[in-house]
From Swiss-Prot:
GO terms for molecular function: structural constituent of ribosome. It comes from Pyrobaculum calidifontis (strain DSM 21063 / JCM 11548 / VA1). The keyword tRNA processing does not apply. Coiled coil: none annotated. GO terms for cellular component: ribonucleoprotein complex; ribosome. Keywords: Ribonucleoprotein, Ribosomal protein. It comes from the Archaea. Belongs to the eukaryotic ribosomal protein eS6 family. One of its GO terms (biological process) is translation. The gene is rps6e. The keyword Mitochondrion does not apply. This is Small ribosomal subunit protein eS6. Pfam families: Ribosomal_S6e.
């Protein structure tokens, strides 16, 4: 019985939302690999997505905190000599380090799945994950209007 936290990012609004996914919906994600796309209607119970939107898996992390790595095939844990992301950011140029990473396939031992919305070409509607009240206020310049009204 897998349970995942899905972090869904929206490129139109620049926002991300986190969802808790339990069985039987979680079973649809088991076996998917990094880079694969699934239809957005899978999440119709959690979020209302526009027609034609797909969800692309971009990564995740396991129970122990090891990130999924697109260069490691299969549902495995491996030590790699990492020289850059994902999983390691070197302090100096040329530094490498032995790091534990997970493979590129989602299994029951994955805790978090990172994904991004892929809109159809020519989409001009509103973003699926809207901006919050503070962001809208910043865009409209609400703070300057309040300051002018108080003087």
């Amino acid at each position: 019985m897998p349970t995942f936290k899905l972090v869904l990012s929206d490129p139109l609004s620049g926002k991300a939302r986190q969802f808790e996914i339990k069985d039987p919906l979680a079973q649809r994600f088991v076996g998917l690999r990094i880079g694969e796309e699934i239809d957005g209607t899978v999440l119709k119970e959690l979020i209302e997505l526009p027609k034609g939107v797909k969800i692309r898996i971009t990564g995740g992390s396991g129970v122990e905190g090891a990130p999924m790595h697109p260069g490691v095939p299969g549902p495995v844990k491996r030590y790699i000599l990492a020289d850059g992301p994902p999983g390691y950011r070197p302090r100096k140029r040329g530094m490498r380090k032995k790091k534990l990473v997970r493979g590129d396939t989602i299994t029951d031992s994955i805790v978090q799945i990172n994904a991004v919305l892929v809109y159809p070409e020519g989409y001009s509607g509103p973003p699926a994950i809207p901006l919050g009240a503070k962001e809208l206020e910043k865009l409209k310049g609400g703070k300057t209007e309040e300051a002018a009204a108080s003087q």
